[in-house]
């Protein structure tokens, strides 16, 4: 979207127009840092001026952020009751399910080792990389980190196989498969991705 590259100064010019016309701004928190939500919240206030109608669209990922529903309610209270604004949240009415193939996972961009995989263009080098012990150790460290940013919960027990040349694996998650073979869930995922590549189809939920 063009607004992705807009400066906050450009946004402020837009806000003036929207406020004058009593129009509605539909925005979204930054997918990784999320700090821009406070800027939108402040712009909605109606202290000594007309409030701007703001609605924030989010996947409301309760898996990676279990207290997110409290944050949204608190922010709404602050914006509407204390700051006299007109601030609303839009969320999905059902879990945000994404379907994936092999290593083709956009959410890998949210952490260093995953971004490295996303940047690799040579397929042979890609599969060579995920079988390096040092890389796997680094990937596991990033996946299990306590303090993370981004949308993905990084929980491979919620990675469910929907299609695979080995039909016996369909309907199982990577943690279950790892336990069967006595390996970590990440190892199970990388091993299956190496063996089946994009024929390994799986899904996970963001909310």
Regions found by a protein language model. Give the residues of each.
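Substrate-engagement module of ASCE P-loop NTPases
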Residues: 19
């Amino acid at each position: 979207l063009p607004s992705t590259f807009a400066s906050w100064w450009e946004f402020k010019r837009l806000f003036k127009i929207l406020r004058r016309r009593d129009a509605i701004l539909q925005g979204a928190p930054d997918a990784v840092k999320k700090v821009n939500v406070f800027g939108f919240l402040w712009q909605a206030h109606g202290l000594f001026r007309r409030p701007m109608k703001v609605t924030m669209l989010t996947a409301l990922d309760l898996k990676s952020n279990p207290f997110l529903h409290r944050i949204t309610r608190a922010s709404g209270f602050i914006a509407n009751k204390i700051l006299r604004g007109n601030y609303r949240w839009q969320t999905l009415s059902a879990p945000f399910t994404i379907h994936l193939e092999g290593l083709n996972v956009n959410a890998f961009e949210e952490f260093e080792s995953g971004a490295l995989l996303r940047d690799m263009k040579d397929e042979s080098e890609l599969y060579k990389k995920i079988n390096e012990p040092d890389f796997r150790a680094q990937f596991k460290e990033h996946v299990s980190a306590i303090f993370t940013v981004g949308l993905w919960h990084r929980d491979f027990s919620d990675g469910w196989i929907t299609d695979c040349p080995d039909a016996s694996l369909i309907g199982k998650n990577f943690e279950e498969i790892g336990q069967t073979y006595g390996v970590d869930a990440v190892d199970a995922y990388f091993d299956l991705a190496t063996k089946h590549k994009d024929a390994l189809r799986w899904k996970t939920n963001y909310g």
